Every structure is written in structure tokens, then in C-alpha cells.
């Protein structure tokens, strides 16, 4: 059975791509009775507020017609930001060499949160260097992952 995120991606990805954007990913977060649907978009050269607004209008129209969400919800459209979320294996592949933080579904060595340098992606295994040790994580066990912003002053 498809998740809500997968259903939404099927509904809106073609429209977003036809507008010249990459749909980086979708997050659905519940807070009490309300649901926040967050779409991350990107394009070469970055995303502006006007871009987010345009995509939001188009996606809202699709969701109004298709009505895939039974509950009340807020739609947010944004750029991935400095702490860009990683949703797919291709995202991990793209950012090899970068510092990332991952949150696991099932703890490994009594830890759910790991931060380290992304070394490789082989099949569905993600390899990080954490505290000078190599650790491998199954992609399916990663609940959430983000780039760690680097500030050079």
C-alpha cells in the first residue's frame, strides 16, 4: 500500500517537473489534528519565493481536484535549504564526500542518530565515516537524513 507521500508524489511530480523544477521530496507531519504537507523543490541556480508560490498554487489546484487528503492540512513549498534532506539513493550518491546526519528507525549500537562523512553508496548500503570508523547503514533503516551545513568564514 502506498504511503501518503508516495500518492502525493504521483499526483504532483509531473506538474512540478513541467514547471522546470525537481521535486526533491515530500514530508507529511502531523501535529494534533492538523497535517503539514511539505514539498521540497529545486532547480539549477536555486529557488525563489516566487517559485515556491507558483508551485504552491499549481499543487493546491491539483489537490483540490483530486482530494487525496481526508484531513485538514497546510501545504508548504520550499527549497531544500542548507540542511537539505536526502530522500533517495540518488540524493546520497550526489552528496558523497559531504557531512550528513541520519536518524535510524531501529537503533544501531544503541544509537539512532549518527553524523559523519558520506563515503559511498553501494546497492542499498550507505557508508559513513563516524569518529574515524567506517559504519554501514541499510537505506531502509534510515528514517531521515540531512546534509550538515558547512559555514566557511
From Swiss-Prot:
Listed under GO biological process in this entry are: ribosomal small subunit assembly; translation
Q: Which InterPro entries match?
A: Ribosome_maturation_RimP (IPR003728), RimP_C (IPR028998), RimP_C_sf (IPR036847), RimP_N (IPR028989), RimP_N_sf (IPR035956)
Record carries keyword Cytoplasm: yes
Q: What UniProt keywords apply to this chain's record, in alphabetical order? A: Cytoplasm, Ribosome biogenesis
Signal peptide range: none
Pfam families in the record, alphabetically? DUF150_C, RimP_N
- Cellular location(s): Cytoplasm
One GO cellular component term, please give it. Answer: cytosol
Q: What role does this protein play?
A: Required for maturation of 30S ribosomal subunits.
Family, similarity comment: Belongs to the RimP family.
HAMAP family listed in its UniProt record:
RimP
The name under which this protein is listed is Ribosome maturation factor RimP
Which species is listed as the source?
Actinobacillus pleuropneumoniae serotype 5b (strain L20)
Task: Kindly list the organism's lineage.
Answer: Bacteria, Pseudomonadati, Pseudomonadota, Gammaproteobacteria, Pasteurellales
**Gene name per UniProt:** rimP
Amino acid at each position: 500500500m502506498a504511503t501518503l507521500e508516495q500518492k502525493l508524489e504521483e499526483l504532483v511530480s509531473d506538474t512540478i517537473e513541467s514547471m522546470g523544477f525537481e521535486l526533491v521530496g515530500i514530508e507529511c507531519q502531523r501535529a494534533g489534528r492538523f497535517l503539514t504537507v511539505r514539498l521540497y523543490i529545486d532547480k539549477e541556480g536555486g529557488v525563489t519565493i516566487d517559485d515556491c508560490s507558483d508551485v504552491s498554487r499549481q499543487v493546491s489546484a491539483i489537490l483540490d481536484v483530486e482530494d487525496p487528503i481526508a484531513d485538514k492540512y497546510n501545504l508548504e513549498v520550499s527549497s531544500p535549504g542548507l540542511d537539505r534532506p536526502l530522500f533517495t539513493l540518488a540524493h546520497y550518491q550526489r552528496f558523497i564526500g559531504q557531512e550528513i546526519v541520519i536518524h535510524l528507525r531501529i537503533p544501531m549500537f544503541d544509537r539512532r542518530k549518527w553524523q559523519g562523512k558520506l563515503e559511498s553508496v553501494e546497492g542499498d548500503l550507505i557508508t559513513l565515516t563516524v569518529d574515524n570508523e567506517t559504519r554501514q547503514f541499510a537505506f531502509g533503516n534510515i528514517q531521515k537524513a540531512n546534509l550538515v551545513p558547512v559555514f566557511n568564514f
